[in-house]
Amino acid sequence: MAAAAGGGAAPFVWKTYRMVEDPGTDGVIGWGKGNNSFVVADPFVFSQTLLPAHFKHNNFSSFVRQLNTYGFRKVDPDRWEFAHASFLRGQTHLLRNIVRRGSAAAGGGGGGGGGKRRDASADGGGGGGDEDMTMVATEVVRLKQEQRTIDDRVAAMWRRVQETERRPKQMLAFLLKVVGDRDKLHRLVGGGGNGNGAATAAAADNGFADAARAGCGEKRARLLLDGDNTGAFGPDAVDFAGFYTGADMFPDVAVDAAAAAAGGSAGCSFAFGVDSGY
């Protein structure tokens, strides 16, 4: 069906023409400036999307080797641009002239066949060099893709390293701020960071104040109690008459007149001797 649609062209050639002609894939594969070649602008996307859709593989190297067997040549060493004398835009009737080299050599006969064989031999010699160059270029593309992947991974690792280095600095700055902020420190220690830290800190402060006030009250109560006991035994409440008169355990001490005259206090008795001769 594809061969009939392509005017007898080989299925591979016709599928390639359809991919190149599709304007929706110009960012991946499209015609060159002169419409006599096609360019694979993005080999990676081409091998991942278009090749599996049209062929049974996604190997870009296999696709390039297949182009070589049909006589396509790489015309630009710096990009994937291929050309064939019969592969022209809008000239689908020429596609049937693009055949595999082995088929062209085997199908020729007589004198014309000799010329075709010579052409095939020449193409084969040149094709071998082109195939080697294609393999090298394909390997370069693969290495570039791997390099891009490695660069992305390195960039991601570097971002993680920077994040890891930034977190301790942020934690240190936070701790320094907390140490300098008493309310925040109370919230972290007492409130658990649940939004009730200020109330908890205030309650703790009030608790300390209440305990201090309670202690002071108890101390004052003890002082008052001790004061009452001391007042109960004050000078007005104690009878010292027996102490001086000997009514209890202490006998009276007699003082003679001479001693009284020397002491200057007649009629005064003491329970103990008084030395007034200093």
Swiss-Prot record:
Residues 105-114 have a biased composition (Gly residues). SUPFAM superfamilies: Winged helix' DNA-binding domain. It comes from the Eukaryota. A motif (Nuclear localization signal) lies at residues 219-222. One of its GO terms (biological process) is regulation of transcription by RNA polymerase II. The keyword Phosphoprotein applies. InterPro entries: HSF_DNA-bd, WH-like_DNA-bd_sf, WH_DNA-bd_sf. Keywords: DNA-binding, Nucleus, Phosphoprotein, Stress response, Transcription, Transcription regulation. GO terms for cellular component: nucleus. Exhibits temperature-dependent phosphorylation. Residues 105-132 are annotated as: Disordered. Coiled coil: none annotated. Residues 143-179 are annotated as: Hydrophobic repeat HR-A/B. GO terms for molecular function: DNA-binding transcription factor activity; sequence-specific DNA binding. Its main location: nucleus. It is found in: Nucleus. Transcriptional regulator that specifically binds DNA of heat shock promoter elements (HSE). Homotrimer. Belongs to the HSF family. Class C subfamily. The hydrophobic-rich region (HR-A/B) corresponds to the oligomerization domain. This is Heat stress transcription factor C-2b. It comes from Oryza sativa subsp. japonica (Rice).
